[in-house]
Amino acid sequence: MRVLLALGGNAMTSADGRARPEDQIAAAQVAAGAVADLLRRDVEVVVTHGNGPQVGNLLVKNELSAAVVPPVPLDWCGAQTQATLGNVLMNALEAAMAERGLDRPTAALVTRALVDADDPGFAHPPKPIGRFLPAEEAAVLVEHGETWEDRGAKGWRRVVASPEPLEILDAPAVRALVDAGFVVVANGGGGIPTVREADGSLRGVEAVIDKDLRAALLARTLGADVLLVGTD
């Protein structure tokens, strides 16, 4: 049996929602124990995860430093959190397997999700992310190409597209590793939203992919028998 375990971003934080490094490591250890128990029953497990709180932390760093250094684009934030959480989860998985006498290799893949450049969400971004800011602070980020909306008394808030994922571009690598016996962490945060240009080249775009759509697409792509969604 092949299972896709989709961990929400909040499942990678403490019970009260804090996302300090030690909180995320502790949460990963809890999730890894459950995965190792499935592996001990000869169940194939692929792990994917959200990254909302983690990207949120990076956005705050962007906001605080925007007057000094250019903000890191959202697709780069997604790539950074995929790598960080992938590393944390691999360490936790290997420790949990060792405790149970299991010897399985692990791998974490920075994964891209193909979206349509003409998706209507890009023309009218519907997804609010990050903190509310006063107009003068939001204006600095608008100068760097971000889209912010006036939300009245609360202040200004950034909005981004939420396109439908069409394809997990790195699914063949995920499938090959799973078939070779690896416990794989992949498609974190729904994958890095990526568009294909007319010349065939690929380009990351600033967007957020719905967590349920991304998990369902990955499960179908990998031929998973079961999709498990873990939350806090």
Residue ranges and their predicted role:
Residues 1-48, 58-59, 63, 176-181:
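N-terminal glycine-/serine-/threonine-rich phosphate-binding loop
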Residues 24-31, 72, 200-226:
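Gly/Ser/Thr-rich active-site loops/lids in small-molecule metabolic enzymes
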Residues 64-184:
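Ligand-binding beta-strand-loop-alpha-helix segment within the catalytic cores
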Residues 6-13, 168, 175-213:
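Catalytic-site beta-strand/loop segments enriched in glycine and acidic/polar residues
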Residues 6-8, 48-49, 105-112, 186-188, ...:
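Short beta-strand segments
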Residues 191, 222-232:
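Glycine-rich phosphate/pyrophosphate-binding loops
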Residues 34-41, 88-98, 217-225:
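Alpha-helix C-terminal capping segments
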Residues 21-24, 60-70, 123-131, 199-207:
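A glycine- and small-aliphatic-rich helix-loop capping segment at beta-alpha/alpha-beta transitions
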